[in-house]
Amino acid sequence: MNIVCLDMEGVLVPEIWIAFSEASGIPELRRTTRDEPDYDKLMTWRLGILKEHGLGLKEIQDTIAKIDPLPGAKAFLDELRATTQVIILSDTFEEFAKPLMEKLGWPTIFCNSLEVAENGEITGYKMRCEKSKLTTVKALQSIGYDTIASGDSFNDLGIIQASKAGFLFKSTEQIKADHPEIPAFEEFDDLLAAIKAAL
């Protein structure tokens, strides 16, 4: 049995932190896992900047409410979900993902959660498990699933390499150059065809 595991940001929706960086006028928040592979380091740094500027969950959610899925993402996901089982694996947080999942037709997402004070300040975050994407893929494999994975970033390489088929999608030139063995696509139709061929 097959199950497709997709990254969310950069694959199905724009990068939330880049959108928030532009909305808030804080260029430092543009850094993502494409730039910093150590997610804990990246999140600790982000939370420090939010605190410094007095920004909390509400401000980020206001930005997320204005974000639409990437053009073609919902049609791609609809067709893929009609063909096989799909789970979105993301390092994002439930508090960020919900409005985006609604716009994508409520696919299943495995992600993390934020710790938020009563005043809306984001005080920390709770990862579902260590190396959550790779741990999830290995768990799915342990219960009889063959995984097919796609993502755009450093933190997707583990699931791509551990799966029976894996693809980079809308990735950086650096990651593509470092991993020429991984097929890379820019268009949803091409990714859909590659996934269907791997089923």
Write out the residue ranges for each language-model feature.
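Short loop/turn microsegments at loop-to-beta-strand junctions
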Residues: 1-2, 150
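Alpha-helical substrate-recognition element adjacent to the catalytic core
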Residues: 2-113, 117-118
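Alpha-helical segments flanking ligand/cofactor-binding loops in enzyme cores
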Residues: 78, 138, 157-158
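Acidic, Mg2+-coordinating phosphoryl-transfer loop and its flanking beta/alpha structural elements
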Residues: 86-91, 145-186
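Short, well-ordered alpha-helical microsegments
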Residues: 94-98, 156-157, 192
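Substrate-recognition "cap/lid" segment bordering the active-site pocket of phosphatases
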Residues: 95-147, 178
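Short, acidic/turn-prone active-site loops that include or flank metal/cofactor-
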Residues: 111-116, 171-175, 189-191
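Short amphipathic alpha-helix with an adjacent loop that forms part of the alpha/beta core around
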Residues: 194-199
